[in-house]
């Protein structure tokens, strides 16, 4: 019988999982249906589909990890299973962060106007550049995830065959290396989003000064596009600022022993990021927003028709 804290944890994690998978699944479904209808897919749709799929995987892994910790705490005594879970979790987490940074770079190249030859070349080659970044993000996530976790497990296994002193040294070094690699892997996408934000802000300030000189008004389409992109990147950065410290605590478990309560709180907080950001993406995309509002109207009408008549 779970305790009160464990029951609250189960309710929260199940609710977050349902909301997150539904939101990200909605993004995948709408874009795939549109893809089949038009027989074509846009670059932004590819980014959103990739991001949503990676987050669905991340949500499932985090939730599965939480239920193992809570209901089957002895599961991770099987080192192979722990290594597999670590690898899948690391891959889903890193791919989610990298795909989000790819979305920020897309906003930057699509909207910003910066008078530099290299930036101008990137804008001309935006499709190839973004697709290359997407593929690179996928490969980087694979490199960071599976080989590192596999090597760590191998060294951890070797450490148990020696004396206690040697075991501590061997198991701690790969654990520290793993933690450092995970942290750097999450930090690079954050820095790319931060750079995109400042370049978008610089482009907006410059554009605002230009339209003030020509007295054309401040709410032109380019300004609106700048503002929407900046808001999207700011929201992501704020969510990541909340997510990243918890991520550091969760990845330090190989060096610092953690209690069940800390791990449960960590799971709850880390699930908030991929769950909530999906709805921000839906409301920030005209096609997704229209489909979402249409679905809400359908559900509202269905519930109204199903409402029983009073006496």
Curated annotation (Swiss-Prot):
Topological type in the membrane: Multi-pass membrane protein
Highest taxon in the source lineage: Eukaryota
Keyword Transmembrane helix: yes
GO terms assigned for molecular function: bitter taste receptor activity; G protein-coupled receptor activity
Leader sequence residues: none
Glycan-modified residues: 163
Side of membrane Extracellular, spans: 1-9, 73-86, 147-179, 257-260
Coiled coil: none
Keywords, sorted A to Z: G-protein coupled receptor, Glycoprotein, Membrane, Receptor, Sensory transduction, Taste, Transducer, Transmembrane, Transmembrane helix
Membrane-spanning parts: 10-32, 53-72, 87-109, 129-146, 180-202, 234-256, 261-283
Pfam families, alphabetized: TAS2R
SUPFAM superfamilies: Family A G protein-coupled receptor-like
Similarity comment text for this entry: Belongs to the G-protein coupled receptor T2R family.
Protein's name according to its UniProt entry: Taste receptor type 2 member 9
Source species taxonomy: Eukaryota, Metazoa, Chordata, Craniata, Vertebrata
Gene: TAS2R9
């Amino acid at each position: 019988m779970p305790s009160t804290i464990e029951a609250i944890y189960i309710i929260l994690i199940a609710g977050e999982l349902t909301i997150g998978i539904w939101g990200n699944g909605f993004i995948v479904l709408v874009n795939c249906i549109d893809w089949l209808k038009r027989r074509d897919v846009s670059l932004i749709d590819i980014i959103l589909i990739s991001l949503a799929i990676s987050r669905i995987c991340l949500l499932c892994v985090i939730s599965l990890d939480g239920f193992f910790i809570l209901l089957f705490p002895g599961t991770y005594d099987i080192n192979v299973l722990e290594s597999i879970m670590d690898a899948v979790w690391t891959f889903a987490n890193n791919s989610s962060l990298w795909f989000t940074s790819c979305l920020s770079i897309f906003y930057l190249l699509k909207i910003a106007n910066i008078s530099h030859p290299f930036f101008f070349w990137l804008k001309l080659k935006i499709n190839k550049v973004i697709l290359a970044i997407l593929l690179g993000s996928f490969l980087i996530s694979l490199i960071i995830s599976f080989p590192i976790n596999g090597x760590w497990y191998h060294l951890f296994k070797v450490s148990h065959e020696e004396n206690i002193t040697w075991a501590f040294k061997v198991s701690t070094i790969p654990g520290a290396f793993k933690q450092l690699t995970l942290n750097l892997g999450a930090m690079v996408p954050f820095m790319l989003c931060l750079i995109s934000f400042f370049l978008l802000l610089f482009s907006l300030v410059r554009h605002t000064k230009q339209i003030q000189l020509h007295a054309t008004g401040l709410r032109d389409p380019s300004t609106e596009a700048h503002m929407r992109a900046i808001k999207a990147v700011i929201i992501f950065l704020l969510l990541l600022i909340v997510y990243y410290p918890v991520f550091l605590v969760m990845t330090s478990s190989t060096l610092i022993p953690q209690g069940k309560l800390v791990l449960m709180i960590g799971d709850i907080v880390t699930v908030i990021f991929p769950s909530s950001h999906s709805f921000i993406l839906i409301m920030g995309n005209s096609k997704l927003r229209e489909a979402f509002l249409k679905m809400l109207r359908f559900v509202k009408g269905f519930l109204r028709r199903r409402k029983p008549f009073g006496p």
